[in-house]
Amino acid sequence: MWSRTLLRHTFARNKRMIAGNWKSNFTLAEATAFINSTINPLKYNPNNVDVVVSPVFLHIPAVLAAKTNNSVIVAAQNCSNYGLGAYTGEVSPKHLKDAGLEWVILGHSERRTIIRENDELIVSKTKLAIENGLRVIYCFG
């Protein structure tokens, strides 16, 4: 049933998306400077395109606070396939929702290659993210 939900949300979109996954490239000062110099001044029609930035977990609150362009979406780079509990170092989809996020990127090629995440794990994460009300940018290929 969750896969139908994913497909419905995926193929129902008529909008384009421009997403920037910052990976682990910016320091906090660089991230907020980029938001202020490049992201906040962007002019575009949010009915036609979604603009998404994806900072590291620790920078999410500062990026949310720094952005003045309310149309810009802040997404997490990953989430756990576990809910709340004793999962040291994991960030659950519920934590992401609590932080004010609506989107998460899952299945990135680097996580597949370096961390060795497989399709089964990514599907598990996707399912839990959707069940917790997150929208998913699902990377495949």
Regions found by a protein language model. Give the residues of each.
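Active-site loop-to-helix "anion-binding N-cap" substructures in soluble metabolic enzymes
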Residues: 2-141
